[in-house]
Amino acid sequence: MASNMANPANHLPYFFGNITREEAEEYLMQGGMSDGLYLLRQSRNYLGGFALSLAYGRKVHHYTIERELSGTYAIAGGKSHASPAELINYHSEEADGLICLLRKSFNRPPGVEPKTGPFEDLKENLIREYVKQTWNLQGHALEQAIISQKPQLEKLIATTAHEKMPWFHGRISREESEHRILIGSRNNGKFLIRERDSNGSYALCLLNDGKVLHYRIDRDKTGKLSIPDGKRFDTLWQLVEHYSYKPDGLLRVLSIPCPRHGSESDNVVFDTRPLPGTPSKLQTPIGAPSDDQTPFNPYVLQRARGLIGAEKGDQREALPMDTEVYESPYADPDEIKPKNVTLDRKLLTLEEGELGSGNFGTVKKGFYKMKKGAKPVAVKILKNESNDPAIKDELLREANVMQQLDNPYIVRMIGICEAEAWMLVMEMAELGPLNKFLQKNRHVTEKNITELVHQVSMGMKYLEENNFVHRDLAARNVLLVTQHYAKISDFGLSKALSADENYYKAQSHGKWPVKWYAPECMNFYKFSSKSDVWSFGVLMWEAFSYGQKPYKGMKGGEVAQMIERGERMECPEACPVEVYDLMKLCWTYNVDDRPGFVAVELRLRNYYYDISH
């Protein structure tokens, strides 16, 4: 489940996955075709949708189950249901538009898993290649991007995948499309798809007995694609997959993609396997003459230089990778990190007004001039009229921790500057602290909040893996770059542990944020990644209560007594039970029984993928 978004039907014994209509009919015939015998399969027309195949009167009836914008499932014109299983249960008691009640499920044979579609098989590689090319990311940054943005990337890939296919030729004229198809082999079933206009319509050009046939592909008001009077599809690749199995209104099946100019020698980028499961007799294209039996995989891609994928300027929601702070400015080989990360004051300009203030001094917005231009920065300026060396040491300690950290979900230090005051120059996160943002923006969805806290868990997992304890993890110290991009900040209390240490012991009780602290911190002054996990539980509570203060109206001592009694904060009103269960797990009293961030991040990731599906 960690690598693939969970299919909400995979656990159902009567779900067969990405099988064709004909395969479904064959299975139900094997099952005896009794009235009310049914199975569930993946829709080959609609993203995230399903199809119900139901036997009645010795015939098989097929019903499309669409996934609605709200995330619910419904048969056209029917009631909405939270899941495919709930829909099936409902129709086993109410026909409500079906030809009969669902009486008996036809289950997969033992050991047979639901069949994944060919696009599913290639999706991981498509995503990896897309991220590499769109944002020029590699290594750790690439992996972090794929994990945190998987749902958005899957949607993006699903709707733009046709642009990377050899059969898609972009905006060319009718005459040019005929010219291209007639170059080289003239086998029946050779085809290409071209863009017709800016309204989202296309044309399918198909070779039949030496003649090029043109079929218009229109997009309706809901965004669905179809040839006139044909089946409707969410994407072009689903349409091509369908017509490569059967003609269904075309003169013949699509069998040989016409390659784009200059692509014949470098046609394959990821995989040359035939479509998974193609040999099945159930998948032989109906009405396809013998000369068209060449195995054709509509998912084999063009080489990288042929990619026309969505660029950053396209009309889509900005992802963290689109921002200037996803990678360190020093990741650019032209930007040389100054020695001891000491910055030249002349290259730093400060703006009027404050972003925030605290015991240490103030934070201002500024710009730091680098080789590739001025970068917006946040500058922590030390207030030290009394010239107290302890305050300076504290700032330098924070700088020392920060300069060792490099992760997309942690505020990076650009450098330090000694001038009219000591200054810590950091990445800018324009939207400010998470708690304040959520207090002012109650419209932010549960999915959006889950996305943000998952990013925080990724940043904390990185700290845990690198033996750093944050010691001040709270919603006020999570800064937002955008509504969909969070970074952990404020490392003033953070400690680096040596390789053989797993906790830090403070010498005395300081000005500590006790409402965020685990029992072992208060009782024994012991701090570890596991105590950060406790704080993360409180941070999640703050996020899902839209920035409310934890333990409102209670003093630190009262909070400690409440925890010793085994009591915990109540579930916030808008918080899903799965998230609250994870909070309670983070608030496990015994530190040895409490999960680490590896487990917490994975659990949040899986939940986020589930609700994004």
Swiss-Prot record:
Autoinhibited. Intramolecular binding of the interdomains A and B (also called linker region) to parts of the catalytic domain keep the catalytic center in an inactive conformation. The phosphorylation of the interdomains or the binding of the SH2 domains with dually phosphorylated ITAM domains on transmembrane proteins disrupt those intramolecular interactions allowing the kinase domain to adopt an active conformation. Keywords: ATP-binding, Cell membrane, Cytoplasm, Immunity, Innate immunity, Kinase, Membrane, Nucleotide-binding, Repeat, SH2 domain, Transferase, Tyrosine-protein kinase. Its main location: membrane. It catalyses: L-tyrosyl-[protein] + ATP = O-phospho-L-tyrosyl-[protein] + ADP + H(+). GO terms for biological process: adaptive immune response; B cell receptor signaling pathway; blood vessel morphogenesis; cellular response to hydrogen peroxide; cellular response to molecule of fungal origin; defense response to bacterium; innate immune response; integrin-mediated signaling pathway. It is an enzyme of class 2 (transferase). Pfam families: PK_Tyr_Ser-Thr, SH2. ATP binds at L355, G356, S357, G358, N359, F360, G361, T362, V363, K380. One of its GO terms (cellular component) is early phagosome. Residues 107-166 are annotated as: Interdomain A. It is found in: Cell membrane; Cytoplasm, Cytosol. PROSITE patterns: PROTEIN_KINASE_ATP, PROTEIN_KINASE_DOM, PROTEIN_KINASE_TYR, SH2. Belongs to the protein kinase superfamily. Tyr protein kinase family. SYK/ZAP-70 subfamily. This is Tyrosine-protein kinase SYK. It comes from Gallus gallus. The gene is SYK.
